[in-house]
Amino acid sequence: MGQNASATKTQATYKQTLPKSRIKELFQTRALQTLSARELASIASKLNIASFNDSHVVTLTDLAYLLQLSNDKEKNVSSIHEDFACVVRILYDSLTILGNLPFLGDSLEADDNSQLTLKSLIVASAVHTGRINSFWNDAEYLKLLFISLSFPPTKQSSEKAAEKWEQVNEDSAELSFRTVPDEKDSSAQIALKIKWADFEHLTTYDDLDVECLRVPADNMVKLITLLLLVRSVRLQSHDKMQFLLQERIEKCWNKFEGAALSLVRFMNVDVNASNMNSKCITYEQFNSGVVNGFLNLFTDVFRRLFENGFLGSIVADPKAPQPLNENIEATATEKESKAAADKKQERIKKAYNFEETRLVNDASLALIATALQASGINEEISRETVVELYNGAHAGFSIRSLESKIFKWQAPTIFLISGKRLRSKTIAQNKRYQQFEDMFPRFFRSTENPRKAWQTDSDKITYAVYVEEPWRNSNKSNFGNELTTIVNLSPRYDIYTSKHDPVIKGMSVYFNNLGMGIGFGNDQPINKNNVRRIIPGKVSLTVEANLEFAVFRHIFNSSANTSAFFNFSRQEAARNEDYEDRFMITDLEVWGIGSTKELEEQKKQWEWEEKQAQARQSVNVGTLSEDRALLEMAGLIGNHGSGGSV
C-alpha cells in the first residue's frame, strides 16, 4: 500500500512500517484535527496565510504576537525588554522541540538555527492545551515540557542522551491501526485510524532519558518570570490586558524575576541570584517542585496563552489601548450590554489606583496567589481584590495600632512580615532580643550551628499568612480554621498548610495584646504568676509583642509532645530538616481580601469581547462551503489529503 511501507496483520490489530517523515506528517495532521474551523480561520487571519503548509515559518515576533505577549506583530521583541526577548527565544526553542513529536530525539541533531513551522506550533499547542490527550491519553505534560526546555542540553547530558538515542535511531517505524487503511483514504482519514497511544516513539518519549537532561536555572527563572507576569493580568478588556502586560514587562520585570527565583529555589535550593547562570535543574527537581508547589502556574498560564492567544478570536491592536466601542452586526440587546459595560469601565478603572508598598506589588501578589491555589484555597488575589488595612511603616509598629486597624475587617486577610536575618552578634548583645529569647525556648544547643546551607546573613526573609477568619483578641484560646496557610515568599518559596485534625480544627492563631505577641502554629502562651513562656509548635511563626523580632520554626525531629498545627515543608530538600528563620522585623503589613465584584465585571467584559470577535468571525466564515474551504486549506478534507499512499 504505497512505497517504502511494509505491513503485518495480527488478530488484534493491523501494523504497518512507514518512513518517519510520513509518520510526522500524519501526526501533524492529527494535531490539526483538534482545531475547529473558527480556530483555523483565526490563525490564518493573524498570519495572513492561504494554506497550512509546513513550509510556513513562524518568527520570534510572530510567536510573541500569536501568544498575545505583544500587541504589535511588526515590533521586534528585543525592543520591548532584553530579558523578554530571551524568554521568547526560550519559548520558541521549546515549541520547536515539541513540534518534532513523535520524534523528540530529532532535536539532538537540530542546530542553533532551527525554525518553528506553523504545523510544529500547532502540535506544540496540542500539548499545552491538553488536546493531545484526545489521541495520546498517557502523555505526561511535565515530562514533555521539561524535555523541550532542556535543549540544547549540557555537553555531558547531550553525550549520554545522544549515545543512547543513536542505538535506536532509524529512518522508519511501525504503527498500529484500529482498522486497515484503504488506498483511497486521505491523510486525515489515515491519521484518525492510527493508534497513537500505542506508538513506541511516543510511549518511550523517543527513548530519551530525562534523567540525563538538564534545564539551565537562569532559563527557568526567565520562563517563570513570564508566567507570573501573564498570571498577574486578570481577564478583562483585551486591550487593557495588553496594555497592562506590556507595562509590567517593561517596568516590573526585575520584581517578577525575584519572585520567579524564589520558585526556582523551591526546585533546587542551591540556586541563588549569583550562581543561577551556572546551576541547572534536573527532571526530578522540576517535577517535584512543580507538582508540590505551583502546578497550576504552568498548566493554567500556558493554556491561556494558547487557548486565548494563539487559538483565540481576538486580534490585538497596538493603536487601541482602550476597548473598542463598535461591533459588527450587534443586536439591540448587545448594544445595550456594551453601553452598560462602557459605564462600568469607569468604576473598573478605580481598581488601578492600587499603590504598591514595600511588601505588596503585582509580583508578590502573583506569588501569593500561586501558593494559595497550590494549597487548594479558592481565593482571587490581585490588586483588584486586596485592601491595605495596616502598614507598620505608616501606622507605627505597635500591637495596639495593629489591633485597631485589622479587627473590624470581617473577611479573609493576608498577614505579611519581613526582615533581616539576625546575626550572631545581635543575638548575643541585643538586650531586647534576649528578653524575647527568655520567653522563646531554644531547640538548637548553643554549641550547634543551626544554619542550613541555603541560609545566609544577607537574606531578606518574608512570610505571608492567609487567615480566613476575622481577627480577635485570643488571650485564652486560639482561633482560625484549616485554611490558615503560611507561605515563605523569600529568600525561597515554600508552603505550610494546616494539618487536618478533628480536635485542633485548625485553630492555630493567637493575637495576644498582653505582652505575648502573635503566633501561628503555637499553643497558647503562658502568662501568669510571673511566668512568661511561648510554646512554639513543630511548624510555627512567632511575632514578638513589640513587633521587633520574629521566628519561623520548622522542627521535623521534635518531641512527641510538641503540637503540630501545620504540615512540614513541601520542598524535598527541607521537608525532613530542622531549621529556623530568626529575623529583625523591618516591615509588617496586613491586607484585607475584598469583594470580587470588579473582577467579575472585568471578566464579563472579556467574555463580551470574545463573543463579539466570534460573531465577527462567523460573519466572515459563516457558510458551510467556507467552513469546508478552511478545512481543505488545512489539508483535513478534500483533495489535500494525499490519498492513495499510506
Curated annotation (Swiss-Prot):
GO terms for cellular component: cytoplasm. The keyword Cytoplasm applies. Coiled coil: none annotated. Keywords: Cytoplasm. Pfam families: TLD. Residues 358-594 form the TLDc domain. InterPro entries: TLDc_dom. It is found in: Cytoplasm. Disulfide bonds: none annotated. The keyword Cell membrane does not apply. It comes from the Eukaryota. SMART domains: TLDc. May be involved in a process influencing telomere capping. Belongs to the RTC5 family. This is Restriction of telomere capping protein 5. It comes from Clavispora lusitaniae (strain ATCC 42720) (Yeast).
